């Protein structure tokens, strides 16, 4: 089965960021990571897919495929080599290590109508529907690397903004040497899948100007379009990339 999310350039860069940089891999564990958020928010509604969507819901439509694939790429161990079997084996280890999700760690909801926009029940033409168009859940992975680190997954339709992002939130220092600084500053690695594909690293710096050491958090921003200086314009989209892989017999992204 093909998951088109895996064809996105930024999703493929997850493995490059993790396993191609000495900076991140030593910190990629429960000693340094506080929690991880995976968000896929859409501004559209079910848009003519009501008969299908009302049977599936957000959990089956998004979580069990797209979000789980992202979770696996974030949490997996380094494969012995970069090929389909080795990558798939490491993903399966993550799936097998997932703890059962407790009912009180799941939130479900539907979008309501407003203005010219219909409600979910109007979109699916089912006034009694209880199928979720939004779902959020807290997952845990029972292995040495991730024990105690919560993974927060959420996805929904008719949200305020369209955004797909993974945020790796690192632990705070626990103690500040700077007098008067009571903010619990955290480094956050944000990987934007859409729109404006790119990577941000939030770091803490001194606020410019006199008056002592006032600290602020600022992003080190890398947007692919800017970093490639136009050289990424001809990069194939997710579906094109996966179709090419099918033709070439490359199953790494399947």
Task: Locate each region found by the language model.
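Secretory/organelle targeting and membrane-embedding segments
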Residues: 1-254
């Amino acid at each position: 089965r093909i998951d088109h999310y895996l064809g996105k350039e930024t999703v493929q860069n997850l493995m490059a960021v993790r396993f191609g940089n000495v900076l991140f891999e030593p910190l990629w564990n429960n000693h340094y990571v506080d929690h991880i958020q995976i968000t896929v928010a859409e501004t559209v509604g079910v848009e003519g897919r009501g008969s299908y969507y009302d049977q599936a819901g957000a959990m089956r439509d998004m979580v069990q495929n797209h979000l789980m694939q992202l979770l696996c790429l974030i949490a997996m161990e380094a494969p012995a080599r970069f090929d389909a079997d080795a990558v798939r084996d490491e993903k399966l280890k993550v799936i097998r290590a997932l703890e059962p999700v407790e009912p009180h760690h799941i939130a479900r909801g539907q979008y309501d109508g407003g203005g010219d926009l219909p409600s979910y029940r109007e979109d699916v033409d089912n006034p009694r529907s209880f199928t979720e168009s939004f779902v959020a859940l807290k997952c845990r992975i029972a292995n040495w690397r991730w024990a105690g680190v919560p993974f927060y997954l959420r996805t929904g339709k008719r949200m305020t903004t369209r955004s797909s992002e993974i945020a790796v939130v690192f632990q705070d220092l626990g103690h500040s040497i700077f007098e008067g600084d009571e903010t619990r500053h955290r480094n956050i690695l944000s990987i934007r899948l859409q729109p404006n594909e790119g990577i941000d690293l939030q770091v803490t710096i001194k606020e410019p100007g006199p008056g002592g050491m006032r600290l602020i958090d600022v992003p080190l921003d890398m947007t692919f379009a800017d970093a490639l200086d136009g050289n990424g314009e001809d990069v194939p989209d997710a579906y094109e990339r996966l179709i090419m892989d099918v033709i070439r017999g490359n199953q790494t992204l399947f």
